[in-house]
Design a protein with these regions (language model features):
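HotDog/MaoC-like acyl-thioester-processing domains
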Residues: 1-17, 102-104, 109, 114-138
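Non-catalytic linker/capping segments at the edges of enzyme domains
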Residues: 1-51, 55-57
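Hydrophobic beta-strand-centered segment that forms part of the acyl-chain substrate-binding groove
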Residues: 79-109, 114
Length: 138
């Protein structure tokens, strides 16, 4: 097994260094990110940027990126954005509108930004926090 970390020069834009290190460690040890080839690029408070270099394994029979690849990258970016708020979240709803499709050799850059938070009462003394995450893939 290679000792080369999965992330390369992840940019820290003002995030606490301990939280930054924790998130980078999560990515490095997470086999999911290694298998899907999603790489962490930048972290800030409420913000995460990931990249995915498109290879043949990401393509459908037409030579275009499969829709599930976009969803995987978007979910990864959203999860990292949750972590920058020092929270752990679950994605309960994700909808994508794909305007165009990338091909082999493209690097998909995905940004996730926490826009807002709302709280709803589930039971007396029990609250659920809902985060709105804006995701942009270029």
């Amino acid at each position: 097994m290679s000792e080369i970390p999965l992330f390369k020069n992840v940019e820290n834009d003002g995030l606490d260094c301990r939280l930054f290190g924790y998130i980078c460690d999560l990515e490095e040890r997470g086999g999911f990110y290694d298998a899907s080839e999603v790489y962490l690029a930048k972290l800030a408070q409420g913000f995460a940027q990931v990249e995915l270099p498109v290879t043949k394994m990401h393509l459908n029979w037409q030579g275009k990126v499969q829709d599930g690849v976009y969803a995987t990258e978007a979910a990864a970016a959203a999860n990292f954005a949750f972590h920058t708020l020092d929270k752990i979240g679950v994605i309960s709803s994700l909808s994508l509108h794909i305007k165009g499709q990338a091909g082999n050799g493209t690097v998909l850059l995905c940004e996730a930004r926490a826009l807002g938070i709302s709280q709803s009462r589930i039971a007396p003394g029990v609250y659920e926090e809902t985060y709105v995450i804006e995701i942009k893939i270029t």
